[in-house]
Curated annotation (Swiss-Prot):
Keywords (A to Z) from UniProt: ATP-binding, Biotin biosynthesis, Ligase, Magnesium, Nucleotide-binding
Phylogenetic lineage: Bacteria, Pseudomonadati, Fibrobacterota, Fibrobacteria, Fibrobacterales
Name the UniProt record assigns to this protein: 6-carboxyhexanoate--CoA ligase
Native source organism of the sequence: Fibrobacter succinogenes (strain ATCC 19169 / S85)
Protein role: Catalyzes the transformation of pimelate into pimeloyl-CoA with concomitant hydrolysis of ATP to AMP.
One Pfam family cited in the UniProt record for this chain: BioW
Amino acid sequence: MDYYSLKMRASQHVGEGENSHEQHISGAERIVGRDSVEAVCAAMVRRAMNHSKGDPDFINVKIEKVHESDIQVLKSLPVTRVDVETWQEGLEKAFGLITPLMALRQAQGPCDGAKKFKEKLQDLLRETFPMRGAMLYDIATGNRLEPDKDRGVRATYMDALHSSEVDGCKNHFNEAIVLATKVANAPGMVAEFCVSDDPNYVTGYVASKELGYVRIMKMKEMGDENGGRIFLFDSRKASAEECIEYLQKKKVLVDVVGRT
């Protein structure tokens, strides 16, 4: 069976003159069978046209054929939930989960990644706010490894296995668990830290092969449009090029099991 990769990106013009730039409004992607292509594309456009961030000035929909033999099927990460009272507590919980993973890798070399990341966490997260993709942060050196610091690194070509949804509503959980599962399986990946940029969604997560997918129910204030994603990577385990190649080009379907 052949599949089709469908990608939608929507943006709007912001500012005037030299300060004019494109601001991301909405994005979505799916991998579906031929019979679902038309309906899913229509749903993606509806989603872009009805976003809380406003009306888009530009919508791009890309359709690409994908051979079944090129697809890797992964079982979704196990899911746990962490309830918190404040977003500050949520960020502390997230770091508390990441720190042991960093410490384990410190023992393998002269890396003070955990300490550096704790000191820089807030600054790193703020740096991701205007980025279109994720930050790729090397825990071995403390350096950012994205080829384009504005664009960042995007994990693409992924969907849930057997997914038949065609409506335009965003399913935050499904989209996040699919992305987190693919990212966790990338060469050299240690963990992922994510806060949604949706002003109406305050849940974030930390994910890795060791932790699974940990939903932290409050990571920012309601109405805050800022959000970002950091991929914590270990350059002693794989090259940045190998990791980015997997994230951006490998086709993946995720068998989503359970929800918390």
